[in-house]
Amino acid sequence: MTGITRRRIIAVGGVVAIGAGYSFARKFAGHFTPPPEFEPISDPAGFRRVSGGSSSLGANPFAGLDGTSEESSGLPVTEVRDSICTALYGEEPLAPGTVPVASFSDFYCPYCRVQTKELARLEDRMGDKIRVAWHELPLLGEASLLASRAALAAKRQGAYVRFQERLISTPFRANPGYLKALSEEIGISYSRLTADMSSDDVGHDIQVSAALADIFGFVGTPALVIGRTVIQGQVGAATLKRIIELERADGWSQVC
């Protein structure tokens, strides 16, 4: 074997070893990632906060809307405080070991679109280990409010997820023509959709989400409550999974 060939083999072997070492180091580091730094919240009691990433900010829960609108006045804060876990996660009982996640988003917040898709993938992968409750928090104007009402109205016809998937995947702003075409495409009644959009029930759902945002101090979207952990801003899949596992281990249900 010549000196040149020997040096080439050694060099290639070194590169392979470095690559394998780097891969191992990444996996090793993943198992020993420092836990998030939690900050206890005094109100509501029992919850804790952890820092998130980017968010789209609003001056108030319904920025840009007429201040006399039903969503911007008379939020049911007292009602929500009295049953905060039901308001966050819904009335349906959770299976043992399931960690609930409440997601607050605006259809036209770019960070929300990424976060919503990540959460949906995570829910599909983790099965009954988590359950996501989707909250509409339209901060970014009239199109956001219209889209939120439409999604909640579609939920009354069992089509929330399909509506959500389409709305977060299109550059188009919600308007009556687009919502009519979307209703026909996914096979739901547009006349019922429009009736439900203006119903008190849909308005109340939006008010409850706004009241929760007020209680937890959310000033933008996306925002999350995972078990008893409150997060303002977008977070990645690894952080989401870590917090979910910590909530399962720490007993999130102590606050509910």
What do these predicted ranges mean?
Residues 98, 147, 220-221:
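A structure-centric signal for secondary-structure junctions around beta-strands
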Residues 84, 166, 230:
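Conserved beta-strand positions that form and line the central face of beta-propeller blades
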Residues 102, 150-153, 169, 183, ...:
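Short, flexible active-site loop motifs that bind/organize anionic cofactors or intermediates
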Residues 2-42, 184-256:
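C-terminal cap of thioredoxin/glutaredoxin-like
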Residues 8-139, 207-210, 254-256:
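Extracytoplasmic thiol/disulfide redox context detector
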Residues 123-183:
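Structural microenvironment flanking redox-active thiols in thiol-disulfide oxidoreductases
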Residues 107-110, 137-142, 170-173, 199-202, ...:
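Solvent-exposed loop/turn segments at secondary-structure junctions
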Residues 115-118, 146-150, 159, 163, ...:
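Stable alpha-helical elements in mature extracytoplasmic
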